[in-house]
Amino acid sequence: MLQPKRTKFRKMQKGRNRGLALDTNVNFGTFGLKAVDRGRLTARQIEAARRTITRAIKRQGKIWIRIFPDKPITEKPLEVRMGKGKGNVENWVALIKPGKILYEIDGVTEELAREALRLAAAKLPMKTTFANKMILS
């Protein structure tokens, strides 16, 4: 699972997920999966989608994961009364804004990339779309 090796603070406030993403272009590969909605992706969801892409392209080509779960999410145990401090860190999430490129693929055909990213999108809790590399001439 993806998670930071070390952080300055163990726990983080919830915060708000507003605005649009900054990195909206396919930079490394030829094809990408772009988020349409905003939301949170857990480390397990990111890994499940990555494994789906790897299986779909039969381990040819190259995959880039453009997101990293760097926000800790805390939970209190079941049947514990309110108060007594913040809960323990249970999982790590990446905050996703609209327009963010989640995954990139290179070295495969467009139809294979479309199919692989379609299968990966089914594992994610948000709407996504297929993105091509912009070539400025």
UniProtKB/Swiss-Prot annotation:
Where along the sequence do coiled-coil regions lie?
none
Protein family membership: Belongs to the universal ribosomal protein uL16 family.
Q: Show the HAMAP family listed in the entry.
A: Ribosomal_uL16
Domain of life according to the entry: Bacteria
- What gene, per UniProt, encodes this protein? rplP
Instruction: Tell me the Pfam families matching this sequence.
Output: Ribosomal_L16
Q: What is this protein called?
A: Large ribosomal subunit protein uL16
Q: Which SUPFAM superfamilies match?
A: Ribosomal protein L16p/L10e
Q: Which GO terms describe its cellular component?
A: cytosolic large ribosomal subunit
